Amino acid sequence: MLEVRSVAKRFGPVVALDRVSFQVRPGELVGFLGPNGAGKTTAMRAIMQLVALDEGVVTWNGAPVDDAARLRFGYMPAERGMYPRMAVRDHLTYYARLSGLDAAAAARAADGWLERLGLAERAGDTVQSLSSGNQQRVQLALALLGEPDLLVLDEPFSGLDPVAVDTLSEVLMEQVERGAAVLLSSHQLDLVADLCSAVVIVDRGRVVLRGEVDDLRAASPVRHLEVEFASPTAWSPDGMGPRPPARRHRLELPAGTAVEQLLGSARAAGEVVAHRYGPPDLSEVFRHAVGRPVDEAPAPSDAEAGSGVGRR
């Protein structure tokens, strides 16, 4: 099990991580979420021992992460760190050897992932000749070599087309099913909600919310009512003011609101063909937790503005 325990990191005056704690268990896929600049990349680099922490500890199976443990980790950084003039297959076999595989096993692993990720026909091409999406696939293959016990993936879906997203999603679920612990960051919250059993949401270097996705949605203080009319209809829900004509109206309500009266006013306004009432989706849970959308960075403090260093 991966445990991040009260980790803290400053870059000059900027607090990148402020006593961040969470766990990822074997066979669990956890979404690591936050706005731009929240501290996600710094935390992931700390897990991989690429950042020296000021406080706290990162452990794997109860012991501090060391070089031996890191050999069982697969890491996909947000910034590509590949050799641009090296052939794709050579790249994979080289990294597989670095992770401890012998030459034959490294070749088998490289060929297997090239085939699985749709890169077999590009095996002899240089990395720099690939599209950004195919470079992303190579980066993922590097992380998957050797069937790692822990996968740390920083924005793995960035730049991928829908077919590649589906392939990657299948691969990640296969890794979870074989017992790997998986931590991934992404701004695609609908995708995270589909894949991840739990999420950790960070903002300004602190954990602001964590738990099972379904539990967090159920515990939200708001609910959504969506009403669909047969044709564009103006509607004035009680106490909410008039709404312009539309086929679909969506209301955000306090949890526990009795909706029958609202539905009655909707039926009085026009022909209602469908309605749905329930907890918010993950993007709304996120917005309520941090107070802004996932792709909006926090306003810098005076210290941050003058430091030239930001969180990732």
Feature names for model-found ranges:
Residues 151-155:
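Catalytic Walker B motif of ABC-type/P-loop ATPase nucleotide-binding domains
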Residues 140:
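Hydrophobic anchor residue at the start of the ABC signature
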Residues 222-292:
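Short, charged/small-residue-rich alpha-helical element at the C-terminal edge
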Residues 169-254:
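ABC transporter nucleotide-binding domain
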Residues 55-69:
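Conserved ABC transporter NBD signature motif
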Residues 93, 97, 105-122:
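Conserved ABC ATPase "signature" region
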